[in-house]
């Protein structure tokens, strides 16, 4: 699958566009964890991607499910997103041409690392350093990120448990101050994250996180 993703990057670049693998696949590759879900970002607009690969575009905030050599890839145009509090879906999407600006909209630094067509890592937000130091850190203002999508509270806990990482202090305090906003999430979204959390086999660490949140509440 990875080789086919690299082929997609080369095709897009041969047509004059920038393109990278990004997100969870890159994170897992660095951690030597198997992953079969590859996301690609590009400055090509959705209609341009569809034209290059002769496929149809179903509008989904600039994302296309691209079938290539029997593999499915999500190809997304560089963009900025505008949110209302606690609403995970942006009310406005603006296509842009700048890679770093696109990466800034993501949740955690560990999910911001890219791979280019040559297989080289592009790390504009120090995600590799945080992986090496086992830290879950928000990109930009943690409070803003959590308010954009409270599911990031559960995602931070999930990554901490699955990869045995520590949640950065400012993010932990932000989680504590906003934990009640989980109630704005749909049951299905909560259940999906909780299933992963409770199946991570890290019950002791989960209890420690819960105890820490209780202590923070007491100290406040």
Language-model segments: which ranges?
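Catalytic cores of the polymerase beta-like nucleotidyltransferase superfamily
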Residues: 1-220
């Amino acid at each position: 699958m990875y080789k086919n993703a690299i082929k997609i990057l080369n095709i897009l670049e041969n047509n004059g566009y920038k393109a990278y693998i990004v997100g969870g696949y890159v994170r897992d590759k660095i951690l030597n964890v198997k992953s079969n879900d590859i996301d690609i970002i590009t400055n090509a607009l959705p209609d341009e991607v569809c034209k290059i690969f002769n496929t149809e575009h179903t509008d989904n905030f600039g994302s296309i499910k691209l079938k290539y050599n029997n593999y499915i890839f999500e190809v997304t145009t560089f963009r900025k997103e505008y949110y209302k509090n606690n609403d995970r879906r942006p009310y406005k999407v603006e296509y842009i041409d700048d890679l770093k600006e696109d990466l800034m909209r993501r949740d955690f630094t560990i999910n911001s690392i890219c791979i280019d067509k040559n297989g080289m890592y592009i790390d504009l937000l120090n995600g590799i350093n945080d992986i090496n130091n086992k830290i879950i850190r928000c990109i930009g203002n943690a409070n803003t990120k959590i308010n954009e999508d409270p599911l990031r509270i559960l995602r931070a806990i999930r990554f901490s448990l699955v990869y045995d990482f520590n949640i950065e202090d400012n993010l932990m305090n932000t989680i504590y101050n906003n934990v009640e906003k989980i109630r704005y999430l749909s049951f299905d979204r909560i259940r999906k994250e909780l299933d992963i959390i409770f199946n991570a086999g890290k019950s002791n660490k989960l209890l420690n996180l819960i105890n820490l949140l209780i202590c923070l509440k007491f100290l406040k």
